[in-house]
C-alpha cells in the first residue's frame, strides 16, 4: 500500500477531473442565452434549450451505476483515462458548434457523397440538436469519473482514512457544478461561448497525464462484462427521466415513459438472477442501510439542482442582475460546500454517522425556507447568510451518505456500490431539473393568467408599464418561492431515510 502522503498527492488529478467534469453540468446556465442567439433558437423554445442541461445530466447519470463495476473488471486507471478521453471528445464536438464553415469548400467537390456529407454535417453542426448530442457524449465520459474515484479511494485507503477523501470527492463535484455558471459568465465576457468547451481540452489532457504517472494499476477482478444488463439499466434510467420531463405538460406521455422504465427495471431484476457477475448486483439493495443511503441521495440531488438553477435565474430576472452577478451570488454557496464536506467527514469519523446527516438536512431545509421569503429588495447580510448556510448543509451530507453506502457492502461489490451511490444523487438532479423545467413552465403560464394587464402582444402591454413590470416581478417571485419550498420539503423528507444510515463506523477494512 502506498504511503499516506503519496496517496493524497495522487488524488489531486483525480479530484481535478471530477471538478471540471462537474463544472460542465451547469456552465450552460449562463451561456444558454448566447447559445440560443447564436443558433437562432426562439425564447418560446426554452424548454427544448434546457435539454442542453438535462441531456448532460441524463448522460451523466445513465453510466454511473455501471462504471464502478466496469472498473472492477477492466481496472480503475484504464477506465478513468478512457472516460476523460470521451469527455474531451465531446467537448471538441460542442466547441465546433457553428464553427465548421470550412466544410463549405467541399460543396463543389466532384463526389456527390462528399458534397452531401459536408452539407449535412455543416447543417447539423449549427443546430441545437448538435449541442445537445455532443453534450451527452461529454456526460457519458464525465459520469464515470465519480464512481471510479470512489473505487480508487476504497482501494487506496482503509477504515476511517476514507471519510475525508470521500467528502472531498463529493465537494469537488458540488463545487464544480456551482462554479459552472460563474466560469461560463467570465469566459463569455471576453470570448465566444465555444471557448468554454475548448478550454476543457488542455485541462483534460493534464488530468490524464497526472493519472498516468500518479495512480497505480489495480488488479482487475476476473469476470465477464454484463453488456445486456448495462443496456437495460441505461434504458430504464433514460425512460424514467424522459417521463419526468413531461411533468405538468403531457401526463399520458409521462405515464408511458415511466411505465416503460419500470418494465425495464423488472426485466433487469429477472435477468440478474441468471448472471454470475451482474453489472449491478440486486442483493446490495436488500441491505436497508444501502437502500436508505441511495434514497437520501436521490432527495439530496433533487433539492440541490433546484437550488443551483433557481438562484441564478432569480438574480438574473426579478433581481435584475447580470449573468456574472448570478454566478457570483451562487459562488457564496459554493464556498461553504467543501467546508461542510470536510466538517461532515470529521463528524462522521468522530460521532454517529447520522449526526452529520441530520444537521445537513436541517440546515438545508431551513435555509431554503428562508430563501422562499426573499423579495426583490433582499440584500446582505441576510442573503449571504442563507446561501452559506445552504452550502454548508449540502456539504455536511456528502460524507455520511457515501460512507454509509460503502460501509454496507462487501469488497466484491464496492465498485458497483460506488457507481450506484453516485448515480442516485445525479438521478435525483436529472429528475429534479426535468420536472422543474416542465412544471415550472406550466406554473409560469398559470400565474400569468392572473395578471390584469393585457399582455397578448409581448413588449406592448396595455396600461402603465411600471404596473405591468411590478406584477410580472411578483409572478417571478411566486414561482421562485415555490421552487425553494419544494427543495426545503425534499430535505425534510430526507430525514426519514437518514434514520436508517449506518449508526456507527465499523472498525474494519470497509469503513
Model-predicted regions and their roles:
Residues 1-23, 37, 108:
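Cytosolic juxtamembrane N-terminal segment immediately preceding the first transmembrane helix
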Residues 9-16, 23, 29-30, 53, ...:
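12-transmembrane solute porter fold
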Residues 27-43, 70, 153, 313-320:
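Membrane-interface helix caps of multi-pass secondary transporters
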Residues 31-62, 100, 106, 126-133, ...:
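Extracellular/periplasmic helix-loop-helix junction of adjacent transmembrane segments
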Residues 35-36, 70-71, 183-191, 244, ...:
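Interfacial helix-cap and linker-helix signal at transmembrane-aqueous boundaries
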Residues 54-68, 146, 150, 331-344:
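Central cavity-lining transmembrane alpha-helices of secondary-active solute carriers
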Residues 64-228:
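Helix-loop-helix hairpins in multi-pass membrane proteins, especially solute transporters
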Residues 189-296, 300-303, 322, 328-329, ...:
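Hydrophobic transmembrane-helix bundles of small-molecule transporters
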